């Protein structure tokens, strides 16, 4: 399958790239600049700014699936504005390219702890990442009105970061709008297993026009 990955050199994007490349898919790895790219034979590395819609659209043409792991940086003081601007531009570029399948890597903040309370509303939610989490939440609401694309929005486990990563188990449980928790009540998943989840979804397409999540 021909897969374009936006944000392919980032923490999540690079893990997804590795997993899909190892499954022998044909990958176009898109990032803002070349420098940390893959050298695998089935990977083509492309440098393009997501805010250049025409150029991005041209690079996406011919893909069977576009995966957006775009993130302007958690320490970026303008992450809220930059994420929403970039996400909307990516969405437009996918449509202009004539690609139907579009998988977005979002955040856990929009998951529901109960029928009314989202993760982002929890008193323990870190203030420093709230702007980015709020942007991802609002972008999910934008996608809910998108009826031209076969979009999917993946919310990682609450504990999905450098400290919980480093191991690929290939095992996970799926969910929809609520965090998947283990026997200890923790929502946790390594970035390597996030990549397994996304690669499996690329191949199976179970959550068209839905948000989904995963955990151990």
Question: Which residue ranges define each predicted feature?
Answer:
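NAD(P)H-binding glycine-rich loop region in Rossmannoid oxidoreductase-like domains
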Residues: 35-96, 203-206
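Substrate-positioning beta->alpha
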Residues: 135, 185-199, 210
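Conserved beta-loop-beta element that borders a ligand/cofactor-binding pocket
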Residues: 141-162
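Glycine/proline-rich active-site loop of Rossmann-fold NAD(P)-dependent oxidoreductases
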Residues: 146-147, 161-170, 201-210
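A conserved pocket-lining segment of Rossmann-fold NAD(P)-dependent short-chain dehydrogenase/reductase
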Residues: 172-189
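Conserved catalytic-site region of short-chain dehydrogenase/reductase
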Residues: 75, 109-114, 159-163
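Conserved Rossmann-fold NAD(P)-dependent oxidoreductase catalytic core, especially the SDR/UDP-sugar
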Residues: 26-28, 88-131, 145, 152
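N-terminal Rossmann NAD(P)H-binding glycine-rich loop of SDR-like oxidoreductase domains
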Residues: 3-23
